[in-house]
Amino acid sequence: MAAGQMTRRVKRTMHQMRFLALLAGLLCPLVLVMPARAQGKVDIEQISAGSLTAMPKDELAVSGGFYVPAYSSVAMSQGKLRVDFSVTLSVHNASETQALVIRRIAYFDTAGKQVESYLKAPVALKPLATITVVIPTDDVRGGTGANFIVDWAATGEIAEPVVEALMVGGVANAHYAFISQGRPTRTVGKK
């Protein structure tokens, strides 16, 4: 093989390698932000087994609830573009000493219709432990006004739980992440 042919072949191979590297550089971010596959019914008790403890035997004397706004979809560009987000709901037991009983974790859509209930029965969360629920990016059943209701209880005085939803998503090269804090549910009005 002549030196000129070898040089052309090497140049062509180098050009092809640069093209493949450029193509990989363009496609890799797309693969990283592709939506997660929607899962079937998730057994939260099994997934969070390390965070759970035995249910308290004493009466549950204290209880409360949280309303947590969640945004599985957000309208952008004057409503012309919808960006879908994954949602991770985290329920943190802020007590260092007591178990926190989670009675209900329910997911509702924009119209207020229950989409999913995540507990078969109440579970007890270890001190300082966390339980999470993940809504994949391609699960848009909640819409732009989705929310969670989390009901909890304890045997006595306890640090109020911390409940938040983390939304993560993106479009093209723009990525977004934001947190929505749970708000305690209370009856408001005249006494």
Which stretches of residues belong to each language-model region?
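Bacterial N-terminal signal peptides
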Residues: 21-31
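Terminal connector regions
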Residues: 41-44, 139-191
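Intrinsically disordered, low-complexity Pro/Gly/Ser/Thr-rich segments with frequent PxxP/GP/PP motifs
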Residues: 110-147
